[in-house]
């Protein structure tokens, strides 16, 4: 990801305030509600039949935390996202057969969740930096597919 020093600072400063458990669960839940076809990858998580069921599904919330924990690790290696996410890219491509477009969708949802939680602090400049980061992470996760 090609970020300026100021953008890197904005991203890491805001990320230091993120409650990974709360926002991870919200981001993955929103993905599954807004894009219901993504639920097929999580059928083993139990009841995902309604938005309410998804929003209160403990396995969805726990996996959302896991996803954002990995995302946070990626933020420590912004200059090597492909290397950082190589194993996850391979897993999602070869074993889970996840459509790589879903990574982009989740990134978009994450930006919305960050904006909702941080309000005025999530300025247009911060949003622009995060848009670059989520695009870079989605690209890194899709790397094995190419």
Swiss-Prot record:
The keyword Transcription regulation does not apply. SUPFAM superfamilies: Globin-like. One of its GO terms (biological process) is hydrogen peroxide catabolic process. Transmembrane segments: none annotated. The keyword Transferase does not apply. GO terms for cellular component: blood microparticle; haptoglobin-hemoglobin complex; hemoglobin complex. The modification N6-acetyllysine is found at residues 59, 82, 144. It comes from the Eukaryota. Residues 2-146 form the Globin domain. Pfam families: Globin. Heme b binds at residues 63, 92. The modification S-nitrosocysteine is found at residue 93. Red blood cells. The modification N-acetylvaline is found at residue 1. One of its GO terms (molecular function) is oxygen binding. InterPro entries: Globin (IPR000971), Globin-like_sf (IPR009050), Globin/Proto (IPR012292), Hemoglobin_b (IPR002337), Hemoglobin_oxygen_transport (IPR050056). Keywords: Acetylation, Heme, Iron, Metal-binding, Oxygen transport, Phosphoprotein, S-nitrosylation, Transport. The modification Phosphothreonine is found at residue 12. Heterotetramer of two alpha chains and two beta chains. Belongs to the globin family. This is Hemoglobin subunit beta. It comes from Loxodonta africana.
């Amino acid at each position: 990801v090609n970020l300026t020093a100021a953008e890197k600072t904005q991203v890491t400063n805001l990320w230091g305030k993120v409650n990974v458990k709360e926002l991870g669960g919200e981001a993955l839940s929103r993905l599954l509600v807004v894009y219901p076809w993504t639920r097929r990858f999580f059928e083993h998580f139990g009841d995902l039949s309604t938005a309410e069921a998804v929003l209160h599904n403990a396995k969805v919330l726990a996996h959302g935390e896991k996803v954002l924990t990995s995302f946070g690790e990626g933020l420590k290696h912004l200059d090597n996202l492909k290397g950082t996410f190589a194993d996850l890219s391979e897993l999602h491509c070869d074993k889970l057969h996840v459509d790589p477009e879903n990574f982009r969708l989740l990134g978009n949802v994450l930006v919305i969740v960050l904006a909702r939680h941080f309000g005025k602090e999530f300025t247009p400049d911060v949003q622009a930096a995060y848009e670059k980061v989520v695009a870079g992470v989605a690209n890194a996760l899709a790397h094995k597919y190419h």
